[in-house]
UniProtKB/Swiss-Prot annotation:
Purpose of the protein: Attaches a formyl group to the free amino group of methionyl-tRNA(fMet). The formyl group appears to play a dual role in the initiator identity of N-formylmethionyl-tRNA by promoting its recognition by IF2 and preventing the misappropriation of this tRNA by the elongation apparatus.
Family the UniProt entry places it in: Belongs to the Fmt family.
Source organism phylogeny: Bacteria, Pseudomonadati, Chlorobiota, Chlorobiia, Chlorobiales
Molecular function, one GO term: methionyl-tRNA formyltransferase activity
Enzyme Commission code(s) on record: 2.1.2.9
InterPro entries cross-referenced by the UniProt entry: Fmt, Formyl_trans_C, Formyl_transf_N, Formyl_transf_N_sf, Formyl_transferase-like_C_sf, Met-tRNA-FMT_C, Met-tRNA-FMT_N
Protein name listed in UniProt: Methionyl-tRNA formyltransferase
HAMAP family: Formyl_trans
Binding site for (6S)-5,6,7,8-tetrahydrofolate: 111-114
Species whose genome carries this gene: Chlorobium phaeobacteroides (strain BS1)
């Protein structure tokens, strides 16, 4: 079975390796990925995508592409005569490309579709406090993330798991599901299930506006929000007119002295020795790891050692 694999980030690498190293009649005839990224230093070589790095290590042919809608791209894919196209964290393919696969093209998605259709399923899973998630393989169709489901595998979300940690785990789970999906397609045993649109939820692309912390939310919601955005793109707030990225937090056990009760407003910041707490709607959030604009990432203790504030009642906003 001739397979073309398409993917770019680290999430796709376990699936690529699993298919390439599988002991069956599957052959990866081409790997398609994004273009190399320029580095900060003009003298340095451009940075290849994680998928390109892995493909080169595996001795596979690689095609870098910018525009998947370019007719020349479809012509190139056609020359490789794919039986199946496997997609993992890549672009939105036009029908002119995915319909070239003799047995079909399928995508690996990091959620239990139809829940969390969109660009950021792992982030929104944690932000919304879900305690279970999984991966889905589905045949590509004309609308994004709506194709018929081939296989799914569920997994619990750990209470303190970050988006980065969950993404890595789902990538490994997904690799096994991709192999099972290929086997079913090869053996003619794929029995696709139509998605129930009434059960669909969205996982839109994250923006600067949607990643800002609202300290008027409950403690648990803020903790989920920060976990769901860590390490990238990261939740953020403002302190002393400067942007602060927040990477790790926890529900805080702290009691203000009676004379300081007026500080109990959302966003109020209290530094207690080497620990720092921020007031939320229903309690305190302890900040464990953060990064001031223009500074390195640091633990709360390092921040507290150099703590300076121009305000009488410091706060995050």
């Amino acid at each position: 079975m001739r397979v073309i694999f398409m993917g770019t980030p680290l999430f796709a690498v376990p699936s690529l390796r699993a298919v390439a190293e599988a002991d069956n009649d599957v052959e990866i005839v081409l790997v398609v990925t994004g273009k190399d990224k320029p580095r900060r230093s003009q003298r340095a070589e451009p940075e290849p995508t994680p998928v390109k790095k892995a493909a080169k290590e595996l001795g596979l042919a690689v095609l870098e592409i910018d525009d998947v809608k370019d007719a020349r791209f479809a012509d190139t894919i056609a020359r490789y005569r794919p039986d199946v196209i496997v997609v993992a964290a890549f672009r939105i393919l036009p029908p002119a490309v995915y319909e070239l696969a003799r047995l079909g093209s399928f995508n690996l998605h990091a959620s239990l579709l139809p829940r969390y259709r969109g660009a950021a399923p792992v982030n929104w899973t944690i932000i919304n406090g879900d305690r279970e998630t999984g991966v889905t393989t589905f045949f590509l169709g004309r609308k994004v993330d709506t194709g018929n489901i081939i296989l799914q595998q569920r997994t619990p979300v750990a209470p303190e798991e970050t988006a980065g940690e969950l993404t890595e785990r789902l990538a490994d789970i997904g690799a096994g599901v991709v192999l099972k999906t290929l086997k079913r397609i090869r053996d003619g045993e794929a029995e696709p299930t139509i998605q129930d649109d009434a059960m669909a939820t969205r996982a839109p692309k994250l923006t600067s506006e949607t990643t800002r912390i609202d300290w008027a939310e409950p403690v648990d919601a803020i903790c989920d929000f920060v976990r769901g955005l860590s390490p990238k793109p990261s939740a953020w707030t403002v302190f002393n007119h400067r942007k602060v990225k927040i990477y790790r937090v926890a529900p805080g056990m702290f009691q203000l002295p009676e004379q300081d009760e007026q500080q109990k407003v959302p966003g109020a910041l209290v530094v207690d020795g080497t620990r720092m707490f921020v007031m939320a709607l229903d309690g305190w959030v302890e900040i464990l790891s953060l990064q001031m604009e223009g500074k390195r990432k640091m633990g709360a203790a390092d921040f507290c050692c150099g703590f300076r504030c121009e305000e009488e009642c410091p706060s995050f906003s």
